[in-house]
Swiss-Prot record:
Source organism phylogeny: Bacteria, Pseudomonadati, Pseudomonadota, Betaproteobacteria, Neisseriales
Pathway field: Sulfur metabolism; hydrogen sulfide biosynthesis; sulfite from sulfate: step 1/3
Species, as recorded: Chromobacterium violaceum (strain ATCC 12472 / DSM 30191 / JCM 1249 / CCUG 213 / NBRC 12614 / NCIMB 9131 / NCTC 9757 / MK)
Record note on quaternary structure: Heterodimer composed of CysD, the smaller subunit, and CysN.
Family: Belongs to the PAPS reductase family. CysD subfamily.
Protein name per UniProt: Sulfate adenylyltransferase subunit 2
Job of this protein: With CysN forms the ATP sulfurylase (ATPS) that catalyzes the adenylation of sulfate producing adenosine 5'-phosphosulfate (APS) and diphosphate, the first enzymatic step in sulfur assimilation pathway. APS synthesis involves the formation of a high-energy phosphoric-sulfuric acid anhydride bond driven by GTP hydrolysis by CysN coupled to ATP hydrolysis by CysD.
Record carries keyword ATP-binding: yes
Pfam family, one: PAPS_reduct
Keyword check for Manganese: no
Length: 308
């Protein structure tokens, strides 16, 4: 560590590293895109991209792969932010999946995720010919992400081979790819969940209200508290489940498709309270994602098939 780095706080060091990665990709690749999932990590990543190119706008579009089952608050914030900031926002929906009636209930979490997220993402990347895609994944989230490089190389079919990763020495990244290949880039790789929350607090970044504890209607399914976000879910609940719907004070540590995302009971209704809760928690935020529990090593299998 040099003298200049020693003067930085750990969050400033993480910020500088992430901005360096974002600028490196923008300079090195012909057609990058930033995936915007509307969660807390995406909010931080986008904030860093805005800083990286201030006073100009980021020189790449944002893209949201919409499964049609996202929380309404997520879509509202996405549209509000895009309008206020004048972003070039691409929203892609896998229409083949919609026409086939794929949903989290009748198709199951694994097939729904594969068709509406993985295949939807691959469709969008192919259609727009993106050669690099930024994502907000962090190494502390899940074991398969812990061994993934900042530059995650994908073959012509968007598949990831965990045994064929390039070395990354210091801040030197090898972005050479053949025609048809691409990379997924993770500028937040070295951040932790606590780092994310502290940075959101310090930088006053707007996030989805679902991260804050509030009274919300929930039903217990598969050992998880699932929020009743709209009426579509009601036709898939059993009479017993409908009778057990209750209002509890809950929040979300992670956000995805609402029927596949579990809430946690919490009193943390402000950013300082969330940070305090993070200091005491001993569980991963990904425990609230049903797709991570489909089978042993399910996340790694999904990533090898093209999942982000």
């Amino acid at each position: 560590m040099d003298i200049d780095q020693a003067r930085l706080t750990h969050l400033q060091q993480l910020e500088a590293e992430s901005i360096h990665i974002i600028r490196e990709v923008a300079a090195e690749f012909e057609n990058p895109v930033m995936l915007y999932s509307i969660g807390k990590d995406s909010a931080v990543m986008l904030h860093l991209a805005k800083k990286a190119f201030y006073p100009g706008k980021p020189p790449f579009p944002l893209m949201h792969v919409d499964t049609t089952w996202k929380f309404r608050d997520m879509i509202a914030l996405r549209d509000k932010q895009a309008k206020e900031n004048g972003w070039d926002l691409i929203v892609h929906v896998n229409q083949d999946g919609v026409e086939a009636g794929i949903n989290p209930f009748t198709a199951g979490s694994a097939k729904h995720t594969d068709v509406m997220k993985t295949e939807g993402l691959k469709q969008a990347l192919n259609r727009h010919k993106f050669d690099a895609a930024f994502g907000g994944a962090r190494r502390d989230e899940e074991k398969s992400r812990a061994k993934e490089r900042v530059y995650s190389f994908r073959d012509k079919n968007h598949r990831w081979d965990p045994k064929n990763q390039r070395p990354e020495l210091w801040n030197i990244y090898n972005g050479r790819i053949d025609k048809g290949e691409s990379i997924r880039v993770f500028p937040l790789s070295n951040w932790t969940e606590l780092d994310i929350w502290q940075y959101i607090y310090l930088e006053n970044i707007e996030i989805v209200p679902l991260y804050f504890a509030a009274e919300r209607p929930v039903v217990e399914r598969d050992g998880m508290l699932i929020m009743i976000d709209d009426e579509r879910i009601l036709e898939y609940l059993t009479p017993e489940e409908k009778a057990s719907i209750q209002t509890r004070k809950v929040r979300f540590r992670t956000l995805g498709c609402y029927p596949l995302t579990g809430a946690v009971e919490s009193e943390a209704a402000t950013l300082p309270e969330i940070i305090q809760e993070m200091l005491l928690t001993r569980t991963s935020e990904r425990q609230g994602r049903l797709i991570d529990h489909d089978s042993a090593g399910s996340m790694e299998k999904k990533k090898m098939e093209g999942y982000f």
